[in-house]
Amino acid sequence: MRYTRQIQLFGADNQQKLLESKVLVVGVGGLGCPLLQLLSSVGVGTLGLVDFDKVEAHNLHRQFLFDEACVGMLKTDAAVARLQARNPQTVLHAYPYALTADNVFSTIADYDVVVDGTDNFSVRYLLSDACAIARKPLVYGALYHYEGQVSVFNVEKDGYTTSYRDLFPVAPQPNEVPTCNEAGILPTISSMIAHFQANEVVKLLIGDLDNALIHTLLLFNTQNYQLTKIKYNMTDKKAPSTAEEVQQFNYPAFCHQPVGDELTTVEALDAFLTQEKAVLVDVREEDEQPKIDRYTALSLPLSVLPTQWEQLKAYDHICFVCVAGVRSMKALNFAKEALADKDLKSFKQGFSPLVNV
């Protein structure tokens, strides 16, 4: 039997709890891929996968569900195929879209536990608020250079619950905390933190709440293997308390993302680029694939952009694009000083809608 060895450890009743459970993983990346593999292997009955992005070659070193044949595929589609092959008993639901205030509540509604595998502060606060309102346990994980963090939110213990906002009531300023795309990441680190998260999910599903990281932030330094646990309490935080308030809350602005500087649809980008002396600047690294083919884009990687302003002075309207709108916004903020007289924008959707059209 597939689960014999773990049944020997924690019993058939707990295994049945896993088989009857439903877990949603938001983000099929460096955390999400190993998380999904582990949760499927341990016997979680139903898994949901949320991610709008496609597989790229530079993902492969840490996103173990994928290989070269998956490049260009939607991450959710590629992951479902691989997970189904690994464990045909797992029920899989793919949600190939970005999580927004419009869809977050319907997306999390049917699940017992939600796991945060994102790398975006705006989505992280949105997901935390929605799970708190819907009373969904949320297993948090984050990476920074050689360190990782794990905690469990929205589970009552000692008469109260805590959320992401109790830990981080204020979002960091732009450029304070880089994403994995910007700072880089080792697959050993993302995999270790994902294993901690998966273990917390199992604890929640079988009811081992006394040992779960509730009201506790686990900090793990992978260089010296120092583990630190920090206790935290419920705070008098300001947060949306209803679905309607989530709809009205400006998450990009709260996370210091100037919405007026963003183009959010392909149609808006089309209109922007029809202007005289307009250009699309791809700030991904040279080896990142696939290349944009909807427009002729100027390739200026973020790593060298501050030395290339002269190339852009010939244009009046400049829009930056990357994978998911993070590096492009950073490029825009850099350009505001060097190109103060230009019309500068960032394309929020990233490159995916601009290829294979």
Task: Describe these PLM feature segments.
Residues 221-292:
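Flexible, polar/low-complexity N-terminal or interdomain linker segments that lie immediately upstream
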Residues 178-217:
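Conserved anion/nucleotide-ligand pocket segment
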Residues 1-24, 248-258:
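N-terminal charged helix/coil linker that caps or initiates catalytic domains
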Residues 50-86:
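Glycine-rich phosphate-binding loop and adjoining beta1-alpha1-beta2 segment
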